[in-house]
């Protein structure tokens, strides 16, 4: 994946607003020292890395009893 887009992420998260919240939470985790869930040899910034992780299906979430796809 040369470029990550919102459309790539929306294949995994069906709501744009939920996607923003999920990406924000993951970026905070990365800033606090969480290990990347995908290869980051390219040295992407945390925001791009979080979106790439979501698009790759590596970030899971649950909303009040409803699990991610």
Swiss-Prot record:
Source species: Geotalea uraniireducens (strain Rf4)
PANTHER family the record matches: DNA-DIRECTED RNA POLYMERASE SUBUNIT OMEGA
A Pfam family matched in the record: RNA_pol_Rpb6
Function according to Swiss-Prot or TrEMBL: Promotes RNA polymerase assembly. Latches the N- and C-terminal regions of the beta' subunit thereby facilitating its interaction with the beta and alpha subunits.
Any one GO BP annotation for this protein: DNA-templated transcription
Presence of keyword Transcription: yes
Subunit structure: The RNAP catalytic core consists of 2 alpha, 1 beta, 1 beta' and 1 omega subunit. When a sigma factor is associated with the core the holoenzyme is formed, which can initiate transcription.
Keyword line: DNA-directed RNA polymerase, Nucleotidyltransferase, Transcription, Transferase
The enzyme's E.C. designation: 2.7.7.6
Entry-linked Gene3D superfamilies: 3.90.940.10
Coiled coil feature spans: none
Reaction it catalyzes: RNA(n) + a ribonucleoside 5'-triphosphate = RNA(n+1) + diphosphate
InterPro entries cross-referenced by the UniProt entry: DNA-dir_RNA_pol_omega, Pol_omega/Rpo6/RPB6, RPB6/omega-like_sf
Family listed: Belongs to the RNA polymerase subunit omega family.
Enzyme class: transferase
GO cellular component terms, A-Z: DNA-directed RNA polymerase complex
UniProt GO molecular function: DNA binding; DNA-directed RNA polymerase activity
Protein name stated in the entry: DNA-directed RNA polymerase subunit omega
């Amino acid at each position: 994946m040369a470029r990550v887009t919102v459309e790539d992420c929306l294949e995994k998260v069906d709501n744009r607003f939920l996607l923003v919240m999920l990406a924000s939470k993951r970026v905070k985790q990365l800033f606090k020292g969480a290990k990347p869930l995908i290869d980051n040899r390219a040295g992407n910034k945390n925001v791009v890395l979080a979106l790439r992780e979501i698009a790759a299906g590596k970030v899971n979430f649950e909303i009040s009893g409803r699990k991610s796809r």
